[in-house]
Amino acid sequence: MNRVTPDRPLSRIDGHAHAWTPRKARARFRWGVFGPTAGVAAGHTQANLISLPADWAYDMLLFCQRNPKPCPVLDVTDAGSWTTPLAEGADLRTDLPRYRVWENGELVAEPTDVVAYWRDDLVSFLIGCSFTFEWALSEAGVPMRHIEQGRNVSMYVTSRACRPAGRLHGPMVVSMRPVPPEHLAAAIRESTMLPAVHGSPVHCGDPSGLGIDDLGRPDFGDPVDAEPDDIPVFWACGVTPQAAVMASRPPFAITHAPGQMFLTDARDEQYRVA
């Protein structure tokens, strides 16, 4: 199933969303507010979510270990737990804007909470998200075209296969941000210092090098308009586990909706390396 109308970014709905605390953001999501979280709670770490039955958890942990660029693990829960030390008092079943529910690799629902779908055997993985370093890029003068245009970031399935792990396999997914040439060095420098949220780009320039035919037709998110001289810059993306779910077809999974992330209490500085 696919929704026809994309959700509006929260930064466009509320001009003060960048100043929300993570706790306030999570409370709003719990009340039913939803939309892409780029620019929300600026300076805090955002995370992708994937929850799988316990008998698939080792495969996912190994998949992440073997593919650290798209799948940098921030936390793994005990089976059945919906809490994380990354966000005091948070509930992983209710505190993301929108979720995706999968059965045998097929998308069956996109609810704003998953209490009704939760199972006692689910192990949840929180995986670093590149929205985290967008604040650092912006502070360095790098324009965020998708935020300027009130759109979700563009994400693409690539021709690069991830290293398989047990039953899990699939392609790497990337996010793309158009960057002016004069800001390319800053974009690479600032993102490289945050490896826990994907780090440096995996590719710059010609999208065909990743097997992407048309930047105007992303597989997830929204198309983003580039300025004439902008260079497309691609970062590994935490939607990669969803691509693995589609390819590997586990019996059940819950993920975040692309671009609609879990807001942690952790500051991005906590993951910055020298």
UniProtKB/Swiss-Prot annotation:
E.C. code: 4.2.1.-
GO molecular function: lyase activity
Lineage: Bacteria, Bacillati, Actinomycetota, Actinomycetes, Kitasatosporales
Regions annotated as coiled coil: none
Organism: Streptomyces avermitilis (strain ATCC 31267 / DSM 46492 / JCM 5070 / NBRC 14893 / NCIMB 12804 / NRRL 8165 / MA-4680)
Pfam families on file: D-Glu_cyclase (PF07286)
UniProt keyword annotation of Ribosomal protein present: no
Identification of the protein by name: Putative hydro-lyase SAV_6940
Enzyme's top EC category: lyase
UniProt KW keywords: Lyase
Family as reported in the entry's similarity comment: Belongs to the D-glutamate cyclase family.
PANTHER family: D-GLUTAMATE CYCLASE, MITOCHONDRIAL
Superkingdom per UniProt: Bacteria
